[in-house]
């Protein structure tokens, strides 16, 4: 990717790159890449004062007869050749102009050394992610209180954000069905009568490091679904620049739904968190299901077909 950006700059394209020098384990290589990019003529900026930039965002802007046209890539994982072979991540490439316009505003704010104050499509921390997640949880609470089916599905690495945890407890008490895949630290205990009996939490630790983040709100006919760079940790939701993008294409939405549902059925590497705080083996399927191996086989076959 660095080589491609260098080539673009050398071919006369305007290239702006934000490099977070505080990226753990990658500080030295990021400094070297920054020098290489600057030497090629790229404009390089180094994060945001007071906030770590953890979003993974690429925006291509083209001038056409009709004006500016955007192509946006938003991911859950870093542009890192080493971790990309070890981590599971998701990436969205879209020509949806409403997403591109807000991505452009994110970059504009970063160039000014500011955080974005308001969004309509993207969820962008530190000011426009946690509050919007809480609003979507509240929507499900309202549906449940009206005796309508309500659902929340979350896949993240860690859950420590007290405000979101308390809202999820409130949702469970209202009758919202909540399913969560939380790989690492989890400060919410499911299955406690009167509090979290409607919450199921599993952790998947397997061949690859689970790293993708998925947010699902609502039943199929009104579902909102996002992929994100942010875990539900206070450091992510209010102390970092993070981006979550809505998945608007029906085919991709169905694919994400299927992936999430498959992970919730994983009884090979998936362990269920119980009400006493321990993780236990589970048996869901007639034959053991390893979601990572299943997705790997699917990806391998699709790569052979050269299809997505």
Could you say what each language-model-derived stretch is?
Residues 85-88:
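Acidic/polar active-site rim loop that often engages polyanionic ligands
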Residues 113-122, 147-149:
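Gly-rich Lys/Arg/Thr-decorated short loops/hinges at beta-loop-alpha junctions or inter-strand turns
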Residues 98-117, 132:
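Short, compositionally biased "basic patch" segments
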Residues 7, 11-83, 93, 98-100, ...:
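PLD/PLD-like phosphodiesterase catalytic module centered on the HKD motif
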